[in-house]
């Protein structure tokens, strides 16, 4: 009894001496586990502390006798916030999609689905259905393919996925072609033809304001021709990381580094093959996304040089789409040397496909990415080894060369000024070996380095021509106060061009059409032919202003053949023959090579660069044909026959270059029609009120592929419009016959017009 009293006294004293205890908080509902254990439950949601410590499921189920459950206020507040957030997101999504989904409500019947496959409302359905079924549509050849996994993603804090699917209306892109472009020169020829035949030039539309000499041409390019279709999705592989078989990859790498890798040596072959072998040995389980995109673009370029046209374009398109899926958006956010290499390869690829606008846009992105890396400043890579510095320099030099090529082809201002290239003028800055390698036979010659070095100096002359003769493709106005200025500029640039040709090393000398080595396919011979074609193409560019001046003078409206030309015009006429000479040598050299070996393994290199050179030369010959036929009171029969002979060779070149290529065939058709209308001798008797019908003229064309080329009631106006908007496929509707037998032309044929080399 005494012990119990002592314990009670201690308990009564303890509250006064110890810290005060907290009052136990009652909860309205305990979880099932705590009720079964009859232990204390703190009521935390979604799991109480006891269940968390024991690792059991915590469930709150009110009993049958429970009528009033007490829920914590913070839990209810959290639920209210989550519901409000969901409602807010749903309202935003409803506002965004309200305007896009409303036009699609009336076209849900089965007939519309079958008849309107190209409509904006139908495309998302196709894309979603095919995308969901693509893993099951791969062909049997995919069994031999490899799929890269474990891609190393570059750090990008802005890479957030936008999950909304939208349907956009059709848009058109207005593109400008300045004075240096082939399209602008063609406009001059057609204005002269309109003067000869008395046709009234078509009134320029909103998209074409080329009314005066030297003006640019602005055309509208419809963009729906490259929209995603069912066939495109079906031909593309299920994953952008898919790769062909090892044997095919090895073959494509060999083709690239033996062809395009020699002409554009900005990717180190040893480094690329070393990385490729490492990825191949680990089964491509770990690879950089940028490197894999660059590899696919290498495969695309190599596939473009294969023998079969059908296989070439199918495989090339597959590799291009994979590369775009890997690096298309990434190239706009990440800057690295591999991204710059990827963009250069995209530019080269787009020049040979129906993506000329993408070539120009990606080229601008490549320049800015290269400048962000400091490739334009040689001091930025002083901490790197000599090989890395060399390929950084080569990358920037190739970007400079492409800048001048595209500026000439599109007639637009160049992006890289010559002042930014002073530190690259030295020969050793773009060569991998010492200059002594040329004189010492014991030292192997760096053929790609030599070729890039001399090409760089050639394009510097081209840059001077663009600045002095074309006003850098800005609003160039002829210097009326000095009639000798064009002659002086042409003579000085021709002198520089010949000095460049005289300074070439022995293994890269300019070749002639009668040289026997043109039939022997070697890497050195191929580079000599390519360099010679570039040389004569620049000769055309230098002397084309004088040819344009001659044509402009001879075919002035109301002032034709009334008085002898002035002394300055006579000098311009004499110098204009140099333009024809360069065009003739271009056609003769290509004709000699392709006659000896019409396969892609000949000495011409990439077919689309050859196409550009021959097409440019054919336009010049057509201008000389117009001059000889209609520019004087007496027809120059010798010159007419000579021009027809050259155009006949050009036709054979187009046919042997690639018979199944729509881009080549479109060039053949265009030159055939232009030669046909330039060689017409008399104005047809049924020409009335500015309308020209040339069906009554049965004169053969210069190339012999057309007997008649009937136009509709618009006559000459339709043909002039055809050249003014070369990229619009609807212009073909103005002609009743195609001068190429057995050829059907499809939409989008002009969007990929040859754009330089």
Swiss-Prot record:
<dbReference type="InterPro" id="IPR007219">
    <property type="entry name" value="Transcription_factor_dom_fun"/>
</dbReference>
<feature type="compositionally biased region" description="Polar residues">
    <location>
        <begin position="125"/>
        <end position="135"/>
    </location>
</feature>
<feature type="region of interest" description="Disordered">
    <location>
        <begin position="1"/>
        <end position="24"/>
    </location>
</feature>
<dbReference type="InterPro" id="IPR036864">
    <property type="entry name" value="Zn2-C6_fun-type_DNA-bd_sf"/>
</dbReference>
<comment type="function">
    <text>Transcription factor; part of the Fusarium detoxification of benzoxazolinone cluster involved in the degradation of benzoxazolinones produced by the host plant. Maize, wheat, and rye produce the 2 benzoxazinone phytoanticipins 2,4-dihy-droxy-7-methoxy-1,4-benzoxazin-3-one (DIMBOA) and 2,4-dihydroxy-1,4-benzoxazin-3-one (DIBOA) that, due to their inherent instability once released, spontaneously degrade to the more stable corresponding benzoxazolinones, 6-methoxy-2-benzoxazolinone (MBOA) and 2-benzoxazolinone (BOA), respectively.</text>
</comment>
<keyword id="KW-0238">DNA-binding</keyword>
<keyword id="KW-0862">Zinc</keyword>
<dbReference type="InterPro" id="IPR001138">
    <property type="entry name" value="Zn2Cys6_DnaBD"/>
</dbReference>
<dbReference type="GO" id="GO:0000981">
    <property type="term" value="F:DNA-binding transcription factor activity, RNA polymerase II-specific"/>
</dbReference>
<dbReference type="GO" id="GO:0008270">
    <property type="term" value="F:zinc ion binding"/>
</dbReference>
<keyword id="KW-0805">Transcription regulation</keyword>
<protein>
    <recommendedName>
        <fullName>Transcription factor FBD3</fullName>
    </recommendedName>
</protein>
<keyword id="KW-0804">Transcription</keyword>
<dbReference type="GO" id="GO:0000435">
    <property type="term" value="P:positive regulation of transcription from RNA polymerase II promoter by galactose"/>
</dbReference>
<feature type="region of interest" description="Disordered">
    <location>
        <begin position="202"/>
        <end position="222"/>
    </location>
</feature>
<keyword id="KW-0539">Nucleus</keyword>
<dbReference type="GO" id="GO:0000978">
    <property type="term" value="F:RNA polymerase II cis-regulatory region sequence-specific DNA binding"/>
</dbReference>
<dbReference type="InterPro" id="IPR051127">
    <property type="entry name" value="Fungal_SecMet_Regulators"/>
</dbReference>
<feature type="DNA-binding region" description="Zn(2)-C6 fungal-type">
    <location>
        <begin position="31"/>
        <end position="58"/>
    </location>
</feature>
<feature type="region of interest" description="Disordered">
    <location>
        <begin position="106"/>
        <end position="161"/>
    </location>
</feature>
<dbReference type="Pfam" id="PF00172">
    <property type="entry name" value="Zn_clus"/>
</dbReference>
<dbReference type="GO" id="GO:0006351">
    <property type="term" value="P:DNA-templated transcription"/>
</dbReference>
<dbReference type="GO" id="GO:0005634">
    <property type="term" value="C:nucleus"/>
</dbReference>
<keyword id="KW-0479">Metal-binding</keyword>
<dbReference type="Pfam" id="PF04082">
    <property type="entry name" value="Fungal_trans"/>
</dbReference>
<feature type="compositionally biased region" description="Basic and acidic residues">
    <location>
        <begin position="111"/>
        <end position="120"/>
    </location>
</feature>
